Regions:
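Intracellular juxtamembrane helix-capping segments at the cytosolic ends
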Residues: 129-142, 328-342
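Helix-loop-helix hairpin linking two adjacent transmembrane segments in secondary transporters
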Residues: 141, 150-201
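C-terminal transmembrane helical hairpin of 12-TM major facilitator-type secondary transporters
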Residues: 287-334
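A late C-terminal transmembrane helix in Major Facilitator Superfamily
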Residues: 341-375, 383
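Conserved MFS/SLC helix-loop-helix module at the cytosolic interface between two early adjacent transmembrane helices
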Residues: 75-112
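Helix-to-loop junctions at the C-terminal end of transmembrane segments
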Residues: 76-89, 276-289, 370-371
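Cytoplasmic helix-loop-helix junction between adjacent transmembrane helices
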Residues: 119-153
């Protein structure tokens, strides 16, 4: 069986052992690059609603369009994971940004279903390259919980702005205004690419473990199957994210909630989720990453089951706030867990691929359920089941780590 060498603790690593990716400028560049990689995925509810209103697509067709974006995210992430260890990351990021710019422009030029699906696929590929380069670069830091908390904190702020500004843009320019927003968002990011380190200094998959006292070396062998199982869990959890996030706006409309109420709830839900990044960092230092992750997944299952029973103003608000908070919370720990195992970014670069694959499949699955008149409760039950699978996998991984690498199992 293959093995990976990993660390027992990285937090007190000495300055001379810091990588280029620990530098504030590098973290800043990677985080800003994440804007272009996650904008469509995080703004998906309002984008889907805008395409429905502006272009008149059915729910099944909207599922295909959402899946096109997410399939592109998968393809871009896989491409990046294959080349990120050896290719200049500035070049990768530039290619991704140019694809985002061109594809969003072409999305405004043809409103027919198939050409628009191709444009959204291309935009997704560009976003996948950007996001994978972002996560692989942040994984090079020796304080994963901190760097990914910073990333998600900033992305939540950006997403709150998106939920505020998108209804205004849609009312004036329709869905083409949203495509142009993503285009103009990507252009200035090209200017900060020189701040991004070109390569990962670590050429191998082995990671030297530095003890808390920073005085001895400890190499712990972890079965290769464990990080791979973590990627499967990411995929399973993002089936929830893809289905819920693509159709929660439509579920609110079906429950006769006003568009103002829906967009306002989405906006405040994102603002509230900022506390998730801060709490995640505090809990990681106090309890490690695994236990809070298991708790958060359990709460997410309960949230989906409540929404499956009834969608009204109360359950809609509860689900948005719970989902927004724990989604960010869970992402911090998922990314942090893989980064504790592998600083080279190989597995972290695969996270967007797993997210993209799940989010490519999930809207289509949800759309099929809805096309059979099974209602939004069937979508929420599907989300709960997918999250339960992720919970089981992470529980198994945690138990195995307690046996082979207890310091990593409860690492922050």
């Amino acid at each position: 069986m293959e093995n990976i060498s990993t660390t027992s603790d990285h937090q007190n690593i000495s300055p001379d052992k810091m990588s280029d990716f620990d530098k504030p400028a590098a973290i800043f560049a990677a985080v800003v690059l994440g804007f272009a990689g996650t904008g469509v995925a995080m703004g998906m509810p309002l984008l889907v609603g805008s395409m429905a209103d502006s272009l008149g697509f059915s729910e099944k067709e909207l599922g295909w369009l959402a899946s096109s974006d997410m399939t592109g995210l998968l393809i871009g992430s896989v491409i990046t994971s294959l080349f990120v260890a050896k290719t200049n990351r500035r070049v990768l990021a530039a290619i991704g940004l140019l694809l985002v710019i061109l594809a969003n422009y072409f999305s405004t030029q043809n409103a027919e279903l198939f050409p628009l699906m191709l444009s959204r696929l291309s935009a997704g590929i560009g976003a996948g390259i950007c996001y994978s380069t972002c996560t692989a670069s942040l994984a090079g830091s020796h304080n994963a919980a901190r760097t990914f908390s910073i990333l998600l904190f900033v992305l939540v702020l950006m997403n709150a702005f998106i939920f505020y500004i998108f209804p205004i843009i849609t009312e004036r320019w329709g869905v083409n205004g949203l495509f142009m927003f993503y285009l103009f968002e990507a252009v200035p990011i090209l200017l900060i690419l020189p701040l991004l380190p070109r390569h990962c200094a670590q050429e191998t998959d082995e990671i030297t473990a530095v003890t808390e006292a920073d005085i001895s070396i400890d190499k712990t062998k972890i079965p290769e199957t464990l990080p791979r199982l973590c990627l499967v869990a990411v995929f399973s959890f993002y089936l929830l994210v893809g289905a819920y996030w693509a159709f929660i706006e439509r579920a609110g409309v079906a429950a006769d909630l006003s568009s103002t109420f829906i967009s306002g709830t989405l906006t405040w839900g994102q603002i509230f989720s900022l506390t998730g990044t801060l709490l995640a960092l505090w809990l990681a230092r106090r309890f490690g990453q695994s236990k809070p992750l298991l708790f958060a997944l359990s709460v997410m299952i309960v949230t989906m089951l409540i929404l499956a029973i009834r969608v009204d103003a109360t359950t809609f608000v509860f689900s948005i706030f719970s989902f927004s908070f724990f989604w960010i919370f869970i992402d911090v720990f998922q990314l942090g867990t893989l980064s504790n195992i592998d600083h080279s970014g190989r597995y972290a670069a695969m996270v967007p691929a797993c997210q993209g694959a799940a989010q490519a499949i999930a809207p289509t699955m949800a759309g099929i359920l809805l096309s059979y008149q099974l209602g939004y409760s069937s979508v929420m039950i599907m989300c709960a089941l997918a999250t339960a699978v992720a919970l089981y996998i992470y529980f198994y991984v945690y138990r195995e780590l307690l046996q082979v690498a207890p310091d990593v199992a409860d690492s922050d």
